[in-house]
Amino acid sequence: SKKFQTLALGATLALTTAFTAPAMAGKDFIKKDLSADLPLSKKKVLITAGPTYEPIDPVRFISNPSSGKMGFAIAEAARDAGAQVTLISGPVHLPTPDRVKRIDVISALDMHQASMDALNQTDIFIATAAVADFRVENSHNQKIKKQDNSGPGMTLTLVENPDIVAAVAQHEPKPFTVGFAAETRDVENYARQKIERKNLDMIVANDVSRQDIGFNSDQNAVTVIWKTGLQAMETASKAQIARDLVTLISAHYKKAR
């Protein structure tokens, strides 16, 4: 009868609600519980990546071959470790990782400003960007023509860019600060000098003169140095190096706090 069908339907809906709601609640509980166990859960991580362009005129600039691949890989690894990640990127040809906030910049001055603006409540700062040390003092608003020069050559006056990672390390409260040292010789020695001079917690050094792990390579090999020790990471994909770095950084961050 219609009355029986109505009662049966009501009972079915009641049973469905009774069993579905707790089941879904259980899934949410498990998801939250797993998230809480991640090493960087609820931590804010700020990462710089890629090169910077220092303009000479509207069509020429000073830069370097950095691809940004290492920084983007670290952003993904930090996100997977539970962090809230902000990625400040120079000009690169890479897609934005899912669930990562990306801020695009061009010059070293842009990156410095963006880093200081985003630094509030940052727990960990990782400076992978290959920032140009110098910029042209007076860049031209119009393209420079050959005939504009009175002689056979042209002289550019360069001025020093702000040291972003050193500025971050001086900030109060200071985030756990990780620098990168891309060197072509005496890699470990130069890295140790930087960690002291810039008051860093850790530094990641690599030899960019090697063709197999250079700027645009998909692989890397690094030595991670801190004030009381070091750890070498042999050649592997940048994704794997990134995961290993995030594991090591999170462990040292917890010890420091």
Segments predicted by a language model, with ranges:
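Bacterial N-terminal signal peptides that target proteins for export
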Residues: S1-A8
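C-terminal segment of classical bacterial N-terminal signal peptides
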Residues: F4, L15-A23
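Glycine-rich phosphate/dinucleotide-binding loop and adjoining beta-alpha-beta core of small-molecule
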Residues: K27, R79, Q84-G214, A232, ...
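Internal gly/pro-rich beta-alpha loop/helix module
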Residues: K27-L34
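Glycine-rich phosphate/diphosphate-binding loop of Rossmann-like nucleotide-binding domains
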Residues: D37-S107, L119
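Glycine- and acidic-residue-enriched helix-capping/strand-helix junction motifs
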Residues: D57-K69, Q147-D148, G153-N161, A236
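Generic hydrophobic/aromatic pocket-lining and core-packing "Φ" positions
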Residues: V59, G71, A75, S115, ...
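Phosphate-binding loop/pocket of nucleotide- and phosphate-handling active sites
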Residues: G229-R257
